[in-house]
Amino acid sequence: MEPRMESCLAQVLQKDVGKRLQVGQELIDYFSDRQKSADLEHDQTLLDKLVDGLATSWVNSSNYKVVLLGMDILSALVTRLQDRFKAQIGTVLPSLIDRLGDAKDSVREQDQTLLLKIMDQAANPQYVWDRMLGGFKHKNFRTREGICLCLIATLNASGAQTLTLSKIVPHICNLLGDPNSQVRDAAINSLVEIYRHVGERVRADLSKKGLPQSRLNVIFTKFDEVQKSGNMIQSANEKNFDDEDSVDGNRPSSASSSSSKAPSSSRRNVNLGTTRRLMSSSLGSKSSAAKEGAGAVDEEDFIKAFDDVPVVQIYSSRDLEESINKIREILSDDKHDWEQRVNALKKIRSLLLAGAAEYDNFFQHLRLLDGAFKLSAKDLRSQVVREACITLGHLSSVLGNKFDHGAEAIMPTIFNLIPNSAKIMATSGVVAVRLIIRHTHIPRLIPVITSNCTSKSVAVRRRCFEFLDLLLQEWQTHSLERHISVLAETIKKGIHDADSEARIEARKCYWGFHSHFSREAEHLYHTLESSYQKALQSHLKNSDSIVSLPQSDRSSSSSQESLNRPLSAKRSPTGSTASRGSTVSTKSVSTTGSLQRSRSDIDVNAAASAKSKVSSSSGSPAFSSAAALPPGSYASLGRIRTRRQSSGSTTNVASTPDSRGRSRAKVVSQSQRSRSANPAGAGSRSSSPGKLLGSGLAGGSSRGPPVTPSSEKRSKIPRSQGCSRETSPNRIGLARSSRIPRPSMSQGCSRDTSRESSRDTSPARGFTPLDRFGLGQSGRIPGSVNAMRVLSTSTDLEAAVADALKKPVRRRYEPYGMYSDDDANSDASSVCSERSYGSRNGGIPHYLRQTEDVAEVLNHCASSNWSERKEGLLGLQNLLKSQRTLSRVELKRLCEIFTRMFADPHSKRVFSMFLETLVDFIIIHKDDLQDWLFVLLTQLLKKMGADLLGSVQAKVQKALDVTRDSFPFDQQFNILMRFIVDQTQTPNLKVKVAILKYIESLARQMDPTDFVNSSETRLAVSRIITWTTEPKSSDVRKAAQIVLISLFELNTPEFTMLLGALPKTFQDGATKLLHNHLKNSSNTGVGSPSNTIGRTPSRHPSSRTSPLTSPTNCSHGGLSPSRLWGWSADGLSKPPPPFSQPNSIPTAPSHKTLRRSYSPSMLDYDTENLNSEEIYSSLRGVTEAIEKFSFRSQEDLNEPIKRDGKKDCDIVSRDGGAASPATEGRGGSEIEGGRMALDNKTSLLNTQPPRAFPGPRAREYNPYPYSDTINTYDKTALKEAVFDDDMEQLRDVPIDHSDLVADLLKELSNHNERVEERKGALLELLKITREDSLGVWEEHFKTILLLLLETLGDKDHSIRALALRVLREILRNQPARFKNYAELTIMKTLEAHKDSHKEVVRAAEEAASTLASSIHPEQCIKVLCPIIQTADYPINLAAIKMQTKVVERITKESLLQLLVDIIPGLLQGYDNTESSVRKASVFCLVAIYSVIGEDLKPHLAQLTGSKMKLLNLYIKRAQTTNSNSSSSSDVSTHS
């Protein structure tokens, strides 16, 4: 036996850490076995060496695992030796005291446990404490704190009778002045615990200690709180302590004397837990505050303070507004006395209690208080911070989700309080966050919390994981869905956190996360290293199935704490009373009979072991720790959450789970992800026993009509209804007569129970077992239930929820916001999710959903988080489908959001849904979107050139088709023309093809009158002509040719005139194309019916009356050549109807083929009787006419007045006949009966161009006018430089200048190429700007401006400088033209100040100076103010200098009005780090003073004394240098 003991000693004394870890468990087993270690008690020397080795080498090891093993071995020795271990206490105590200050929480806790065990089994507590008193003066603050905690634990475990407290209290009093706050807090808690056991004598004795009165007050307040709580141990036995007995006297107190009158109640049977648990449980309801230490507050303190405010009354909304404005004024200025600020915060609570939330304007004013709340939360006065936190908590608890904006705004500020060393501030912040998390379930709070989980502060990280755990316990699953990935990533980081307590909290979070999203949790689990996986499992095991306890009772301490928890933790969000807790759970077990459930939301296999015998596939064994628990254990009960009870949701027992234990409802979106891993409960939020399908009717009564067989046939789908996690009432055919009650807390659920009782937490309200329906086993369920087919129409949905339509009418037709405190109106409500109700193609009955707040939907759409944008789009779809029209302001904001969404990077997730929403939006609001059409059309066309998935591209095409059919054709056409010539756009080949195809399809539907020969049209047509020779793409070439032919066919006369105005090269290209087209079409020899096939009839057939008249006499019904060309199917014998039958000509190709091919040979003309000679003569006529027209059009341009005089002379008859003016001398030719449409075209080209258009437009033709409707559109919608001819009139333009400018523009469009040529072009343009060529500017100004601004980004600095010089010259000569482009020009000019080349900067400064003197002062200042406030150096400097020049031009009255906008930016500039910016700001202020004088002074109140002195100095200097000063206070005034 002797050698065995020596070998143990050798193993203990070895230094190798690995071997120690191996032999540790063996030593424990050896010492625990009395037979093997019989020699342990015989050799005292060996035992001494053994214990000494354990104490010095193991317990003092640097490896915490060795330390824990050493303690376990000592614990085994204590158990083995009992009181014989007393001799070793002196050996081990120094090491154990040191370990009380260990950095590892697990080491400290095990150390406490071992010490308590020694006191319990080896020696009496006083013996041990006599040797531990030195720990109160230990150099490690954690050790000093640990000693206090150990004392508390000893008092709880052994009682006060076993200790001579008179020896200990002085040491505790010394620690009250400890430099470390945690030690001070622990000391106070120790005194409180002594008071709890001993009674009032402690108060009297402490008064004799000479402690500072402030410290005594804090301690005595704690004493009073404990006394009021009813947790006193010795209150009944206080008479046993004589007056002369003292806990601090020279002789032992009666509590510690052996002859104590109080009976010694043995407390050794108390289960030994961690010190923190013992402490928190013993202090009852004050546990959290006591745990935090002196000055700390908890939720109960907050709840008491909610009502502890003066009573006020609100008489009107005006009264409320005035009160809040006063409060805001006080809170926004920290110069007010702190007591005033505290009273103001209390008054907010008073207003809330007086019913402020019932007033409409309250929430508007509440938003304005955000800044004041932030300031209060940052206050240096702890009392102000405390009141601010209490007020925020009160707002959250009263307003619920309506406090979303305030909560989101203030949360980051509150987080900054957590690491504060002042406990009152830190704990106030913590409690405020907890209250907000409990009551305001806004998904936007999740990123705020998760971002702080990676804080550098350990305290913040710990708290954040606590908050996350609370959030996962309290919130509904749908509120978490959009942040699944963020939550998983945060929990993963927490599990790897450097701090042990943070890791523990993160592991709790993991299991909370698992209860919501089992699949993601399993995925996360498998990504962890094995050691972390073991830690997660051990956390579950060590918690003694505490994870599976009902949520209302889950805590880190004994059940006493949960009984004494603050009321707020137990009440429902609506303020109802405490939940029924575990008693309900117990009752429900008996009620449900055999339906005892396992913890299936943790264990994916648990459903298989439940009594319902549901077959399911096996999940990961890693999560099966709860599966083996007996049916009657806590784990077999449903999880009753305080805030998430299921009052009877139905679960499809037979839904087939996948390998991850989740129902395979594939069409269900992410928003329908199951909270439970249990296949049988995959659609539900809670695991309450009453949740199984067999549950019958609430109260036993049927609430809806039986489901008919037809509807039953359509509803075999695991589709949620209203509640995105609940299954359909009629998924199982047998439940057809039941109306399954659902928890009213889940979004979109039926309101069959009243609002007052909607939070009923009973898990079993009259549910019956499955056997009642014969559904005890899954085999009895029809196989068709598992088919899981998808509902595709709204009728399916209506049938599936026929009973839901019986809900009270009151709830269906409520206006917005009436019940927005209800969860169904939260921004995360599953009513937002269309997929949570029906398939994408299915309609959603709008009366089945609570409509969402439009502002909330728009906020989601504008979010930077893609999942929130997706949620917003779903909400918007619901709004649009419910025929909810948007206001003008909402429309404007939504258009801005949609404009940004065109560039959304999440194409599959968000952009696809955006396109679907866009189509609905266009259809409903097309009449209000005219101003946004340019952006819509151009962005969609750009998207056609992007690399998109086929499905997404199809949606873009659909959006284009809807756009084409929804807006006026002429407006679309003009936008496309403008887009083509826009120099800022560089469309790729795909975009070009998309544009051309769109124009071609548009041309087939346009009226001839819609084609307008404007400058943009001519420029666009010339560009399209160049595209017909695109070398890189045959698709572009073909599409461009088809567009030219389509436009020619659309309005031959006007298009011919347009060609005549183009340069010769363009004419030749187009004429050649048209010749070939006509030649090819004539060679086909078919009388093409494409007049009705290749061309889609106009939406207004009645307006097809010929828009042009010819001087010729039509012998066939007076039909115009244009009409003959475009619409004749039967030759000239009769005008055909718009929709001729394609089968009128048997040899014609099929309708479908012709429509698809867009073949030029199939366009609209009739060649039935043409021979080749006539064709070529006609072609020659067309060519000659174009050439002649190019000269005539120039003559016409020189006679604008004459043309106007002719305007009324052209008379157009309804049948297409015309009376030509007598003065018209140009060759009108007669058309004989045998001549064809082509000759009519030729003859038309030989006539005088001017014609009056009939119908709505009633305008004459001229080559340069632009559509009036488009002008209006441009002014209102397009701030950027687009081609707006609002000032366009006919001018006398010399032909050489027009051609020259066109060539220059073409040259300038070669960006970053041909540097020398472009320099020459810019110099030439510089000359033209100095000449008085008004016509050039009328036609080309916008194109020139755009090209110049684009050239400012050129690679060559000399080009950039030259462009600025040209721009400056145009500003000098044409200032009025910049009115609509001021913002763009100013921005580009100011940005040029950042250039690295001095030459460019100098040119930019000159241009800015000219801008300041050219543009209207008020307009200029409105553009400059935001730039000054937001831009960085040097742009802000240039803007301030420019503003200074503008101020010198402005009138006093105008400047006074704009002062509110100007001053903030200048004051900001006065504080700038750049001295030049500060100087410029001062000069600008001086210039303002020169204009308005002393009126400036009130706006400078924020300036410090030194800055005011400096400003006054400059003002005086300016006054003295200006001899023309009108007065001492006004240096100069400018009108």
Curated annotation (Swiss-Prot):
The yes or no answer to whether the keyword tRNA-binding is present is: no
Q: Which GO terms describe its biological process?
A: cell division; cell migration; establishment of cell polarity; establishment of spindle orientation; microtubule anchoring; microtubule nucleation; microtubule organizing center organization; negative regulation of microtubule depolymerization
PTM annotation (Phosphothreonine): residues: 656, 708, 1092, 1096
What InterPro entries does the database record attribute to this sequence?
Answer: ARM-like, ARM-type_fold, CLASP_N_dom, HEAT_type_2, TOG, XMAP215_CLASP_TOG
Q: Enumerate the residue ranges of region (Localization to kinetochores).
A: 1253-1535
This protein's UniProt keywords:
Cell cycle, Cell division, Centromere, Chromosome, Coiled coil, Cytoplasm, Cytoskeleton, Golgi apparatus, Kinetochore, Microtubule, Mitosis, Phosphoprotein, Repeat
- What GO terms are given for molecular function? microtubule binding
**Residue numbers carrying Phosphoserine:** 246, 545, 548, 558-559, 568, 600, 636, 646-647, 649, 684, 688, 695, 702, 711, 784, 794, 820, 1088, 1110, 1193, 1220
Q: Where in the cell is it found?
A: Cytoplasm, Cytoskeleton; Cytoplasm, Cytoskeleton, Microtubule organizing center, Centrosome; Chromosome, Centromere, Kinetochore; Cytoplasm, Cytoskeleton, Spindle
Q: Which GO terms describe its cellular component?
A: cell cortex; centrosome; Golgi apparatus; kinetochore; microtubule; microtubule cytoskeleton; spindle
Positions with biased composition (Polar residues): 267-279, 645-658, 721-730, 1079-1094
Q: Does the keyword S-adenosyl-L-methionine apply?
A: no
**Expressing tissues:** Highly expressed in brain and heart and at lower levels in kidney, lung, skeletal muscle and testis.
Q: Which residues form a coiled coil?
A: 1296-1327
Q: Where is the composition biased (Basic and acidic residues)?
A: 1200-1213
| Principal subcellular localisation of the protein | cytoplasm
Please list the residue ranges that the record marks as compositionally biased, kind Low complexity: 252-266, 280-290, 548-567, 579-594, 612-633, 673-695, 1103-1112
HEAT repeat ranges, renumbered to this chain: 87-124, 163-200, 405-440, 441-477, 971-1008, 1339-1376, 1457-1494
Q: What is this protein called?
A: CLIP-associating protein 1
**Native source organism of the sequence:** Mus musculus
Q: Which gene encodes it?
A: Clasp1
